[in-house]
Amino acid sequence: NTRLPLKIKRGMSIAFIGNTLLDRSQDFGYLETLLHQAHPSHDLTIRNLAWSADALGLQPRPANFADTDQHLVFVKADIIFTAFGFNESFAGPSGLAKFRGDLANYIAATKAKAFNGKTGPRLVLLSPIANENVEGVNAAVNNTNIRLYTEAMRDVAAAQRVGFVD
C-alpha cells in the first residue's frame, strides 16, 4: 500500500516509468531536485526509465533491449512513479473499460514483484496532463477524454491502494 505523502527512507531507489510526461522530465530535473531537496540526507537513487509513447499495453523497444521490469530490477526500485493514461486516452470513452482493467492488472502485477529483492514497490500514479490548445489541434476533444481517464486512474488507485497525483 502506498500512502501520500510518501515516507521515504534513507538509501531508497526511486524509478520513473511511463510516457512522455516523465520521459521529457529528464530534460529538466525538477522532480528529482524536489525529491532530493525534501530529503537532503537520504542518499536517494533516482532513475528515469520512461520512454515517449509508452502505454500500459505497448512499450516498444529496440531489439535486444531489456524490458521495463528488467530495468526496475537493475535499479532495485523501492518506489515507482508511473505516467500512463495520456496515450490511452486517444481511444476515447470506448477504451475506458479496457484501460481500467489494464491499469488494475498492471498495478497488481507490479506490486507483486520485489524489484529491490525484498518487497513489492510502492506505486504513485501521475495523471496525464491536458493537451495544449495549439493552432490546428482541437485540444478540447481529447481533454474531455483525459478527464475521463484521470478519474478512472483515481478510482483504480484508490481500489488498489496506491498513490495518485492529479
Language model regions located:
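Alpha-helical cap/lid subdomain in secreted, periplasmic
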Residues: 8, 29-47, 54-166
